[in-house]
């Protein structure tokens, strides 16, 4: 990124982001729906800082719902993840009863039939205030696919994470900056938000993600 003329001081910058009409964050950061990252403790901490935590799905349904309730008990924002397998419909039903701020269809490959099906199910069952996010994808075609399914937010990133092995094990992926650029350039609906998922090692990586089109 090349520095350019500016009339804005760092202290004047507004870091808030409006993901949907009902969901606004003070900082544009979500904690990952990974079992080593986000349960209620992390979700509470990041919500207090102005972001949003996504409770991971590697829990039985009752435990995941319990983690969501711990955050909601403090009147804080929280999201939760579901997968695309046959048992995930029950998980989605249970979580949606908790008035989530965001539900995330969290899969390694979001451009698939089963992902479309569970998005369609959630779309019918959720209330208007619950944001619907899905991923992960890395191409404009996949983004259009998720838009057709009816998501509010798209999660971009196949294999960029520091501990992710997708590119090594499956030989599949797109460099993260290219993925963001391609997805943002390939969709006409600017109201749909893009999350850059993975690959943030230094603070400067945030700037690059924003410049490429991430929200």
Model-derived segments and spans:
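An N-cap/entry alpha-helix motif that binds or orients negatively charged groups
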Residues: 1-29
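Generic structural hydrophobic/aromatic packing signal, biased to beta-strands
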Residues: 1-2, 15, 31, 53, ...
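Short FAD-binding loop at a beta-strand-to-alpha-helix junction that anchors the flavin cofactor
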Residues: 28-31, 198
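Alpha/beta enzyme core
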Residues: 37-52, 57-215
């Amino acid at each position: 990124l090349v520095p350019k003329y500016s009339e804005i001081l760092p202290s004047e910058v507004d870091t808030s982001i409006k993901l949907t009409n009902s969901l606004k964050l003070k900082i544009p950061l979500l904690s990952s729906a990974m079992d080593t990252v986000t349960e209620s403790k992390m979700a509470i901490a990041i919500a207090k800082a102005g972001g949003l935590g996504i409770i991971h799905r590697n829990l039985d349904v009752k435990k995941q719902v319990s983690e969501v309730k711990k955050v909601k008990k403090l009147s804080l924002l929280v999201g939760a993840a579901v997968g695309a397998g046959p048992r995930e419909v029950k998980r989605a039903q249970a979580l949606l009863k908790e008035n989530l701020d965001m539900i995330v269809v969290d899969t390694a490959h979001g451009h698939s039939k089963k992902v479309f099906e569970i998005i369609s199910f959630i779309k019918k069952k959720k209330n208007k205030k619950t944001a619907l996010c899905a991923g992960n994808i890395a191409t404009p075609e996949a983004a259009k696919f998720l838009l057709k399914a009816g998501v509010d937010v798209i999660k971009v990133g196949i294999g960029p994470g520091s501990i992710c092995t997708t590119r090594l094990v499956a030989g599949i992926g797109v460099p993260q900056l290219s993925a963001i650029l391609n997805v943002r350039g390939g969709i006409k609906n600017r109201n749909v938000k893009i999350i850059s998922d993975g690959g943030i090692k230094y603070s400067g990586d945030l700037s690059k993600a924003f410049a490429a089109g991430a929200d």
